[in-house]
């Protein structure tokens, strides 16, 4: 909030321009990271492991570990099905988050309103994540994940009708309502599906899926926006990812989510 204020109201901080506000924002973030990293460096002791790390052929061994983990995952059908669904819908979700500013800019909204909209998303997202967790306990993890994806589908459809900054703020608020909740519920569902003795390697693969997923979405949005010469066509095209994602989810055995 302070950094955003430095950009929007530079004169209040005795700065000459918004550009200077951006520069000092980066500096303040660096100082923030340094100060709050000090306790980590001083008081957190690293555990010692007996296993020695072999640095010969690191890339080959990394790919081999990923391949071996994938072979293990294939033995657990519910896990594999969920990861396929997750790849689809998380790609679309991350695309919306990452390209929101570019989308707003293409629609002609000024940068100040876009930044405020992003902050608005974060303010809503923090309490909404806790509320989402409560609702997931009450109505079920699977049900709330489906609800979250349906809201994202509505966001894509609603984006076709944006005509003002108010509409963009509504979209930002909707994203804030479900962004953290969908991610946390997804991780919880995955943790319920996997064997606990393999949690480390399976979650490593889960994170790899999440990081590598943001490839198709941006390319799809850019391609469709270019073909139709309209950024709205790009956002609505994300339904190509959301719909398979939500449909594949229904093939995950619900009984697998129940822990003994």
Could you say what each language-model-derived stretch is?
Residues 143-158:
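Structural signature of the two symmetry-related core transmembrane helices
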């Amino acid at each position: 909030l302070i950094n955003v204020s430095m950009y929007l109201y530079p004169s209040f901080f005795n700065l000459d321009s918004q550009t200077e506000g951006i520069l000092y924002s980066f500096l303040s973030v660096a100082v923030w990271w340094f100060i709050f990293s000090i306790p980590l460096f001083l008081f957190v002791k690293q555990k010692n492991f007996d296993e020695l790390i072999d640095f010969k052929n690191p890339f080959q061994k990394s790919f081999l570990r990923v391949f071996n983990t994938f072979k293990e995952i294939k033995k657990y059908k519910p896990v594999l099905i969920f990861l396929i669904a997750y790849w689809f819908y998380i790609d679309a979700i991350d695309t919306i988050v990452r390209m929101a500013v570019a989308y707003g800019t293409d629609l002609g909204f000024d940068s100040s309103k876009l930044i405020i909209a992003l902050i608005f998303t974060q303010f809503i997202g923090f309490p909404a994540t806790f509320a989402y967790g409560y609702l997931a306990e009450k109505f079920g993890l699977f049900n709330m994940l489906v609800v979250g994806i349906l809201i994202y589908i509505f966001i894509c459809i609603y984006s076709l009708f944006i005509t003002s900054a108010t509409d963009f703020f509504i979209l930002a608020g909707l994203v804030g309502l479900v962004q953290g909740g969908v991610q946390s519920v997804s991780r919880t569902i995955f943790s319920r599906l996997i064997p606990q003795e393999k949690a480390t390697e399976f979650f490593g693969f889960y994170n790899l899926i999440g990081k590598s997923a943001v490839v198709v979405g941006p390319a799809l949005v850019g391609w469709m926006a270019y073909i139709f010469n309209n950024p709205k066509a790009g956002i609505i095209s994300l339904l190509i990812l959301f719909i398979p994602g939500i449909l594949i989810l229904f093939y995950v055995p619900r009984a697998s989510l129940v822990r003994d």
